[in-house]
Amino acid sequence: MQDVQRTIEVSVGPIVGLDYTLLYDTLPETVSDNITLPDLKDPERVTEDTKKLILKGCVYIAYHHPLETDTLFIKVHKHIPEFCHSFLSHLLGGEDDDNALIDIGLFFNMLQPSLGGWITKNFLRHPNRMSKDQIKMLLDQIIKMAKAESSDTEEYEKVWKKMPTYFESIIQPLLHKT
């Protein structure tokens, strides 16, 4: 299998080591009943809404993860951060900036209407300090807010272009919380 490519010219996947059939079987029925197995392997073939549905399903299975020694964790769950990175990158337009951090202040302000009652800049900087439920709420909100948009906006340049890497760093601690 080829390595994951993170450019708009090349489809993302397959992710080495990820058992796509097992991933498909692990997704909640609300997701798996509305997608095909090839949809998981090629984010370019699905709509924005389907990408969001798949990402929500991945957050669900990350939240309900088995022990790290379980075969399911080894074949599926440990690959979820990289898988989400690829799908979110395609959802946002394929231009991905792995080398820079999101603008925490701008992102914090963007989250105020939905998560302002509890989110702090400290949580955004250190996602491992959030509870399992808080991480899930943040990931769900990112998916809800995500959309392909013009690349010439401040929000795109400072937040969304860098979001796939940030999302990956947030979902990772979720896999290790009980």
UniProtKB/Swiss-Prot annotation:
Q: Which GO terms describe its cellular component?
A: host cell cytoplasm
Q: Which UniProt keywords apply?
A: Host cytoplasm
Identify the InterPro entries for this entry.
Major_non-capsid_tenuivirus
Grouped into one coarse class, the protein's main location is: host cell
Q: Where in the cell is it found?
A: Host cytoplasm
Transmembrane helix as UniProt keyword:
no
Q: Name one Pfam family in it.
A: Tenui_NCP
Lineage: superkingdom: Viruses
Q: Does the UniProt entry include the keyword Zinc?
A: no
Q: What does this protein do?
A: Induces the formation of large intracellular inclusion body, organized in amorphous and crystalline arrays. Presumably the main cause of the stripe disease observed in host.
Could you say which protein family the record assigns here?
Answer: Belongs to the tenuiviruses NCP family.
Q: Report the protein name in the record.
A: Major non-capsid protein
Q: What is the lineage of its organism?
A: Viruses, Riboviria, Orthornavirae, Negarnaviricota, Polyploviricotina
